Amino acid sequence: MTSEFKLSPSILSADFSNLQLALDQCANGGAPWIHVDVMDNQFVPNLTIGPPVVKSFRSKTQKFLDVHMMVIDPEKLVEPFAKAGADMITFHIEAAADTLGIIDLIRSS
């Protein structure tokens, strides 16, 4: 039996002054997904990418955008990231007051 796996390089390691280069490297390297780490400087001690950047990514690539939210109150960001073009949204259950509600929100977005 063979296992299928998806390579999802994180854009977090990119040079933020040249994100287009990082998107091109992912495309040229054959990665089907791009992992987007979202940090709010509250749930984790770093501040990274928001919905406008994901919207920009979506306009530049058709790769699967895997958005990983490391944020307080993730329910507030589901719709903005979905509208920006995220293909998958994940969150930390310990940051959520209503885990099942957020899952339903993601599914409906």
Residue ranges and their predicted role:
Residues 1-90, 94-98, 105-108:
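Conserved N-terminal beta1-alpha1 strand-loop-helix module at the mouth
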